[in-house]
């Protein structure tokens, strides 16, 4: 398996394809994804990806956004690729001189993977909120909502 920095101009269509295959309500808008990210590939097939936000003022705090996966990949290969992706995010964070990388997940399947990669559970009962500063550009937030919230909004 190989890793590379993602290039949203090239890789965004792949991410959208994965999100559609996973039945996401909407794709994540390209302009809110971080310019930094990692793609794991094998034989020119993208397997998984994660984004890394960093503060342009060089704070020591980063945010890993997503661990997006190709649903056509088998579980064993996918697990290895996700593990590699986390290791590459760690390396990228070191290069960018970040001290901490924060992430959130509601996916039970990722808990053990994160812990195996020395990530520390810091909150177990959290609600996520977004302040929509540009409602004219982001009037539909289903791409960031959990299914339980989407169900209540659609009622």
Question: Where are the model-predicted features located?
Answer:
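Short amphipathic alpha-helix that is part of the acyltransferase structural core
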Residues: 1-28, 140-155
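Generic alpha-helical hydrophobic packing signal
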Residues: 3, 46, 62, 88, ...
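Solvent-exposed amphipathic alpha-helical surface segments
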Residues: 22, 26, 92, 96, ...
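A short helix-loop-beta-strand connector motif used in the catalytic cores of GNAT acetyltransferases and
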Residues: 26-48
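A short beta-turn/loop motif at secondary-structure boundaries
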Residues: 30-32, 56, 106
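Conserved beta-strand in the GNAT
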Residues: 39, 45-55, 60-66
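Terminal substrate-recognition subdomain of acyl/acetyltransferases
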Residues: 42, 94, 102-155
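Acyl-donor binding region in acyl/amide transferases
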Residues: 60-118, 124
């Amino acid at each position: 398996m190989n890793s590379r920095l993602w290039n949203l101009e090239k890789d965004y269509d792949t991410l959208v394809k994965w999100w559609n295959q996973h039945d996401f309500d909407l794709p994540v808008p390209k302009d809110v994804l971080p310019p930094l990210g990692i793609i794991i590939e094998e034989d020119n097939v993208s397997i998984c990806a994660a984004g890394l936000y960093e503060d342009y003022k060089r704070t020591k705090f980063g945010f890993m956004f997503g661990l997006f996966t190709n649903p056509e990949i088998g579980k064993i290969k996918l697990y290895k690729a996700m593990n590699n992706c986390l290791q590459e995010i760690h390396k990228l964070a070191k290069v960018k001189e970040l001290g901490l990388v924060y992430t959130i997940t509601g996916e039970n399947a990722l808990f053990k993977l994160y812990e195996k990669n020395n990530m520390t559970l810091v909150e177990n009962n959290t609600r996520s909120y977004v302040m929509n500063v540009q409602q004219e550009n982001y009037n539909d937030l289903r791409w960031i909502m959990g299914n339980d919230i989407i169900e209540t909004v659609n009622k």
